């Protein structure tokens, strides 16, 4: 498909949730295309049926849609170079492999699993790297045809040159060369007729006109074999962008097989999609020039400024604290009504009595870092927890259990006044403040005990008058009276 436009593809396997590293690959692939006004393609690589997970294709679709990484061509919307599901392209792979065999660039291998296991065991015993020994590499044509006619199981292997070097240029790691003698004759078609991952990638990418291949640095060692395939077919070699791994710590990679966080896990914990995407982009990539010190970027911002020269060669360590900080910044920047909409499901999971959610959210938003931590802050709304009266003692506010009883008794008539509008927080605060002035006390002397009386906690989403207005007059008066009784002993 000749074109001078950039064409990239994200080609995930439907094996479960969207791992952080996979989402980063999708993001970089999308940004590479969109920054250059190119085409972003979604292709589903489902030929490894042993790892296929039911429903995982929908996870891929939903994740990309939620994050705004919308594809221009793909299985659901079609395009000029479909089908976009690998298992629907099966007839191509055998055809291309047999073309290489006919041209002497690949060969049928009849070695059994038992022979290969014995070969590898012997190689390991001699301290060698395991590799295929080329047993079937130069079988006479007549013997090959006879064994094929007899129905003998086989694989098709790539015939790697034994001499010389194969080099390639990577946009991150630069020029890399590998001695051909160090490369194994890799399998292209397995005994069940299915293509291997490496072979299918090349045979899919070329007809789709892929110009830039973006993937993890673990594929650097396979890239010379990819190039030899491109050369064998006489096809143009795409640009390579290999990204450093995302690490859990200095020694261990993030891995969905080890239960490390997926995109779905992070959303379920209350991280915002936009914050996750922003943070993932910074895992192994840094902005340049005037944006070098900036950390908060919308997807539209990233489309404008992202270039592959910002990708690091060094592994990126997933830092949960950094993700929290970025998420907190996104929460603070939300319009109040949008924060309320996002926080409401978390509030409703913890509070089942009527409360002023708008006021609650006004107090939560400046303090909230992760939405999933909201419920644990609200466990006193439905029922007053048990607490010790020693909580009323506070040096800063100059309160004691005895002074708290005096303060609450002074507040009771103020809060009982039918004219006091509990829907207006400022009005309630001013009434309490006036009572403090009348008593010659500071506001905290009066309002700190009110907060304890209403929540049984030292830390709450809002001060005493905020809590009173969230709960309403009836609950407030019930709890203040109960607190006075508790303090009476």
Predicted regions and their residues:
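N-terminal Rossmann-like or analogous alpha/beta NTP/dinucleotide-binding catalytic cores
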Residues: 2-125, 222-235, 275
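Residue-level signal for inorganic ion chemistry
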Residues: 29, 60, 100, 104, ...
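Glycine-rich phosphate/pyrophosphate-binding loops
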Residues: 34-46, 199-212, 233-247, 461-466, ...
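Conserved phosphate-binding loops in nucleotide/dinucleotide-binding enzymes
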Residues: 83-87, 110, 189-190, 208-219, ...
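Active-site cores that bind ATP or allylic diphosphates and position pyrophosphate for catalysis
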Residues: 102, 107-242, 248-254, 262
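Small-residue-rich helix-loop
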Residues: 336-439
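Charged substrate- and nucleic-acid-binding regions of tRNA-handling and nucleotidyl-transfer enzymes
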Residues: 426-488
């Amino acid at each position: 498909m000749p074109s001078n436009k950039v064409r990239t593809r994200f080609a995930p396997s439907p094996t479960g949730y969207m791992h952080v590293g996979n989402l980063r690959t999708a993001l970089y692939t999308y940004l590479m295309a969109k920054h250059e006004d190119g085409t972003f393609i979604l292709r589903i690589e489902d030929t490894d049926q042993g790892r296929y997970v039911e429903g995982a294709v929908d996870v891929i679709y939903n994740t990309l849609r939620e994050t705004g990484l919308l594809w221009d061509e793909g299985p659901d919307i079609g395009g000029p170079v479909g089908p976009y599901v690998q298992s629907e392209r099966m007839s191509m792979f055998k055809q291309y492999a047999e073309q290489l065999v006919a041209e002497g660039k690949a060969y049928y291998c009849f070695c059994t699993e038992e022979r290969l296991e014995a070969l590898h065991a012997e190689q390991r015993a001699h301290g060698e790297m395991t590799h295929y020994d080329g047993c079937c590499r130069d079988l006479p044509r007549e013997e090959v045809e006879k064994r094929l006619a007899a129905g003998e199981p086989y694989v098709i292997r790539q015939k790697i040159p034994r001499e010389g070097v194969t080099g390639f240029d990577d946009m991150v790691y630069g020029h890399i060369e590998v001695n051909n003698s160090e490369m194994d004759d890799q399998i292209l078609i397995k005994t069940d007729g299915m293509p291997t991952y490496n072979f299918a990638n090349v045979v899919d990418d070329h007809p789709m006109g892929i110009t830039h291949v973006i993937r993890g640095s673990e594929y650097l060692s396979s890239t010379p074999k990819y190039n030899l395939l491109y050369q064998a077919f006489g096809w143009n070699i795409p640009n390579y962008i290999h990204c450093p791994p995302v690490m859990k710590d200095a020694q261990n990679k993030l891995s969905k097989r080890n239960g490390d966080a997926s995109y779905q896990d992070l959303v379920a914990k209350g991280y915002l999609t936009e914050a996750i995407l922003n943070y993932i982009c910074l895992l192994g990539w840094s902005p340049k020039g005037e944006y070098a010190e900036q950390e908060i970027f919308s997807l539209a911002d990233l489309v404008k400024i992202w270039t592959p020269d910002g990708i690091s060669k060094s592994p990126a360590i997933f830092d949960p604290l950094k993700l929290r900080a970025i998420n907190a910044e996104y929460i603070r920047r939300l319009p109040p009504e949008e924060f309320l909409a996002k926080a409401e499901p978390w509030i409703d999971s913890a509070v089942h009595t009527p409360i002023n959610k708008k006021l609650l959210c006004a107090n939560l938003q400046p303090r909230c870092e992760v939405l999933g931590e909201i419920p644990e802050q609200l466990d006193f709304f439905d029922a007053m927890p048990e607490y010790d009266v020693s909580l009323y003692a506070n040096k800063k506010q100059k309160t004691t259990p005895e002074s708290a009883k005096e303060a609450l008794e002074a507040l009771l008539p103020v809060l009982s006044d039918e004219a006091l509008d509990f829907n207006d927080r400022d009005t309630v605060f001013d009434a309490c403040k006036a009572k403090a002035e009348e008593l010659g006390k500071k506001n905290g002397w009066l309002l700190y005990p009110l907060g304890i009386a209403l929540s049984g906690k030292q830390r709450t989403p809002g001060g005493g008058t905020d809590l009173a207005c969230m709960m309403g007059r009836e609950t407030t008066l019930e709890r203040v009276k109960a607190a006075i009784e508790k303090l009476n002993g």
